[in-house]
């Protein structure tokens, strides 16, 4: 009986120790979403001081700056926005291919990614005293550095050009705009 008790104890310990090393999906996801540094190089982005002539970006806003930790938070929110946009695009693509089987497509042209773009960040304090930022993405700088001092505005071009607004207080994004295709 003593051997049986030791055997049961060993079996229980091995079961408990195996179970203790498992991570559930939420734990894995939180580890993957942990970002401790902003990884863009200075040649890929610029933080621009808001100019009241850019009234179409924000109304009644005041210029402000961005901290390293805010850039990291923005990156997390951007990843969420990209994932949600691309899921919506996939749903639309499936619906299109089902409705028009003779015109199958593999992408909508509005799928997005974060890598491979230049970025312009325009941070402001809005009327409510909340920090917001408009981020402009573009895959072609046309061989100049003008984009570091002037807002890059391009018509058409599809998912090569898009922009988004993020409210850092509420941690929400809005007004995701993706250029159309001519």
Residue map of PLM features:
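Surface-exposed acidic loop/strand-edge motifs in secreted or periplasmic proteins
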Residues: 31-146
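Extracytoplasmic electrostatic interaction patches
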Residues: 128-182
